């Protein structure tokens, strides 16, 4: 029984609600039919996409967004992180429809083909002004709406002591795993890096906010030394735990906006860094599709076909993801070792599922040659040396 596991945690919350109030909450969801999905693997990658990104006649249209993603990214990307989704604005109709019911219907098209990730932003003003019962109900509702991953930002618990925050996260993680054993609580934490590891006790995945800044600096300087040293300091997560890696997040500008001259080669090399690291990689739709504001689906498809720059970025990122999906050493749980090769090259060794990969990314505009051999994952050819042109990358399988 879930209550036997939850009661000790709820008692530690010092919440104003009674035990009967909490029991009624879980009784409310007892009749729901829950669907779990596959455990995360090398097949797992996330597209961060604004729920308002695609429009029809200037109005947000989840159906049009679904069609776009189903037709153009489903074969390469497994998960959608739908941001700006709550509260949901339904399309006007002649009949009054409960927005929650309409959202469930709208999202049903997505979770037949993608795993879904939503954000949870607790309505917290200080330790005393928070309704944990109501927030927990909202958390469970996201699971009922198809989420297999829920992102929670620690800083949204304004004024709440860290110990109590961890009790809330412990409660939500237990609820998530009860309803969806393969689900993941994704924690966004931008505090002291030395304290990040302590949150693995109450989360399955922790966001790497520092990756973007270290990657930007590496390309700006043409030197991977700082990026290499940072990555080498990352603690290996425990069993069943991993990281959430991204070059830009919903709260910030797209990665390429911070580059002086973001060439196609530079953007693809940056994504090689992203996909090389242990964890679940997340791609920003603004970078993948080359958009910054809502756009009509037909216009977006036409622009992707006719704009060489956007098409090369789009197809290049998906090409990397397609290779990643076929190698178990890219599992988010596969081992990682940072290798020092050349100061201009970021090098990662990944091992898992009986294979070892060496992943090289040139962050400079120099030509670099490294003494290494293996099978090039993109061409299938054996190479006796790693030859990297400006902003080039090569992924090798060791024999």
Residue ranges with predicted function:
Residues 1-373, 379-399:
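Active-site and adjacent substrate-binding regions of carbohydrate-active enzymes
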């Amino acid at each position: 029984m879930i209550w036997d596991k939850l009661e000790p945690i709820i008692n530690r919350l010092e919440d104003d609600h009674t035990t009967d109030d909490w029991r009624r909450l879980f009784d409310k969801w007892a009749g729901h039919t829950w669907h779990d999905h596959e455990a995360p693997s090398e097949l797992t990658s996330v597209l961060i996409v604004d729920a308002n990104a695609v429009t029809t006649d200037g109005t947000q249209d989840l159906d049009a967004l679904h069609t776009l993603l189903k037709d153009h990214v489903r074969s390469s990307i497994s998960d959608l992180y739908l941001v700006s989704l709550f509260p949901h604005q339904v399309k006007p109709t002649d009949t009054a429809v409960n927005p929650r019911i309409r959202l469930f219907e709208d999202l049903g098209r997505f979770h037949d083909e993608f795993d879904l990730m939503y954000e949870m932003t607790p309505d917290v003003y200080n330790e005393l002004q928070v309704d944990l019962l109501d927030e927990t109900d909202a958390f469970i509702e996201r699971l009922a709406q198809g989420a297999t991953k829920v992102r929670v930002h620690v800083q949204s618990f304004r004024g709440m002591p860290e110990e109590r925050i961890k009790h809330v996260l412990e409660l939500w993680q237990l609820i998530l795993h009860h309803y969806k054993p393969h689900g993941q609580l994704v924690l966004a934490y931008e505090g002291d890096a030395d304290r990040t590891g302590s949150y693995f006790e109450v989360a399955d995945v922790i966001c790497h906010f520092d990756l973007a800044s270290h990657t930007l600096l590496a390309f700006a300087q043409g030197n991977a030394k700082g990026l290499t040293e940072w990555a080498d300091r990352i603690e290996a997560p425990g069993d069943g735990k991993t990281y959430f890696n991204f070059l830009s997040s919903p709260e910030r500008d797209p990665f390429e906006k911070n580059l002086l001259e973001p060439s196609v080669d530079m953007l693809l090399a940056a994504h090689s860094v992203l996909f090389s690291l242990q964890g679940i990689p997340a791609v920003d739709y603004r970078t993948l599709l080359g958009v910054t504001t809502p756009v009509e689906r037909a216009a977006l498809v036409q622009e992707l076909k006719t704009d060489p720059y956007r098409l090369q970025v789009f197809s290049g990122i998906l090409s990397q993801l397609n290779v990643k999906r076929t190698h178990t050493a890219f599992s988010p749980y596969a081992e990682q070792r940072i290798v020092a090769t050349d100061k201009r090259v970021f090098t990662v060794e990944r091992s898992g599922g009986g294979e070892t990969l060496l992943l090289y990314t040139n962050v400079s505009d120099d030509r670099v040659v490294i003494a290494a051999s293996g099978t090039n994952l993109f061409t299938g050819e054996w190479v006796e040396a790693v030859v990297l042109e400006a902003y080039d990358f090569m992924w090798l399988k060791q024999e």
